[in-house]
Amino acid sequence: MNIMVFDVPAINGGALSVLNDFYNEVAESNDKNINWIFVLSTPTLKETNNIKVLRFPWVKKSWGHRIYFDQFIAPKLVKQYQVDKVFSLQNVTIPHVKCKQILYVHQSLPFVDYKFTFKDNKLFWVYQNIIGRNIINSVKEAQRVIVQTEWMKKACVERTQVDSQKIEVIPPVINLEVKGNFKTSDGSLSTFFYPASGAEYKNHQLILDACREIKKISEKKYKVIFTLNGNENSYVSDLYKQVQKEQLPICFEGPKTREEVFDMYTKSILIFPSYIETLGLPLLEAREHKGFVLASNCPFSNEVLRNYENAYYFDPFNFRELTTLIDSILKKNLSYVSPRIDDTKGINQHLISKVLSEVR
């Protein structure tokens, strides 16, 4: 059997992690009855006796190159290699092919309630209104759909009206080596941490607004740590200028290694105001470290933090709710409790076991 895996968008971040994890599972499966053909852009994966890797780096040059690849090159590859089944890790199916397709959907923008205007964010508007239509049509066309979370499954069913049995939830593999858990101390209960990129939907501004309000009502000492340099884009530059001008207790410490982020979960409180995520990985990571978490009240956070005693929620569009939570912690009106053992057991599964069962 010939199975072709498409993932030309993956070059970094979570998408690349999903690709690498899946490739490793395939490489370790040792099933000689399946020939795997990985179709990628720039990532380099090792070929084996039953794994072939096709790279098309020019796909990343522009949207036009990507559209040309999807509409003409991809279908030709399926026919050229006499593919029996396609596994698409890139949110959309391959057009103009007759073989069965399994679709992995991890782009949440077409399914969230928040709607971007073209003026607010051109790229996200395109994802929601143009690419989003393609993703929704692909969910309808694929024989099987895999998503990372229950909320995504529910949203897919609501938007596409497909049979819910067609969509399966398989959380991504999260390789965590937990070396320590959150410890309460004066330092940890007055340090807040937000590991996130500088995208606007990550909602750093809400934290600034909350800090500005706390400055008016409290003299308690605390600090907030961002994993930003302060010059990533115009949005982040504006955040940095606000912090400097108003002397808010926010530190721009720049990117941190995975190990450094894990260490921060043990000695600070995670603030997560993002309102557009599929999973919200820091939430899961903090929970694994038995951390103290303040999270936006959204479907993804409710799912990842379900039944977790040390998770508190706020409206991601109401800074006063976050202000109240931070102020309550600083005044010791909101306390950390020792979580039950085994809180996160069973959250993660391996993708490959389900995929192989679908493709035989």
Where are these regions (language model features)?
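Conserved donor-binding/catalytic core segment of Leloir-type glycosyltransferases
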Residues: 4, 185-202, 208-211, 225
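Aromatic "clamp/platform" in nucleotide-sugar-dependent glycosyltransferases that forms part
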Residues: 275
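A conserved mid-protein helix/loop that constitutes part of the nucleotide-sugar donor-binding site
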Residues: 13-24, 199-215
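Membrane-proximal helix-turn-helix segments that form the acceptor-binding/catalytic region
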Residues: 76, 124-145
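Conserved acidic donor-binding segment of nucleotide-sugar-dependent glycosyltransferases
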Residues: 311-320, 327-333
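Glycosyltransferase donor-sugar binding loop
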Residues: 42-43, 223-237, 254
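Donor nucleotide-sugar binding/catalytic pocket of nucleotide-sugar-dependent glycosyltransferases
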Residues: 140-158, 162-179
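Nucleotide-activated donor-binding/catalytic signature segment of Leloir-type glycosyltransferases, i.e.
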Residues: 237-259
